[in-house]
Amino acid sequence: PIMRALLRLSAFILCQSLCAAPVLAEGKSIIVLDASGSMWGQIEGRAKLEIAREALGTVLSSMDPETEIGLMAYGHREKGSCEDIELVVPPAAGTAQAITDAANAMQFLGKTPLSEAVRRAAAELKSTEEKATVILITDGIETCEADPCALGAELEASGVDFTAHVVGFGLTEEEGKAVACLAEN
């Protein structure tokens, strides 16, 4: 199928999931970072936002500097808003430091409009004739009344050479399934 999906769920070690996934090999990529208020929660005594930032840094430092990658975030500017989605760093080669700096400066305070954020990232990448990859890093499920499963099916049907990767952590089994269908479709 045109949309290939990889689901990596990790209960505790986000970095191992991200570092093991060959998600940044070719084409353009956008990492969609969950900056919602729930990222202040903890796993084994560590804030989830700290784990996500560390994993992001590890992935970026291990990739080819010529890889075109960008960063989109949600929940980082407004508390309680489903519209708080921003392309913070447009996909380009050599953006690793800009992405790291943006993630390190980010506030974590809003809701989780993950479906709309992935839709916008896919739209941003749609103009490319290369393979396009969206990597969603999240600790939660959709909180803005959208359906990640329907979005996955819609993106699959759109005909874009598109891959979605979902890295979920700190999720219950039910929450994991709700997010996984985005990538599985």
Identify the role of each PLM range.
Residues S61-D64, K126, E156-A157:
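Residue-level signal for alpha-helix termini/capping positions
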Residues R8-A20:
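Bacterial N-terminal signal peptides
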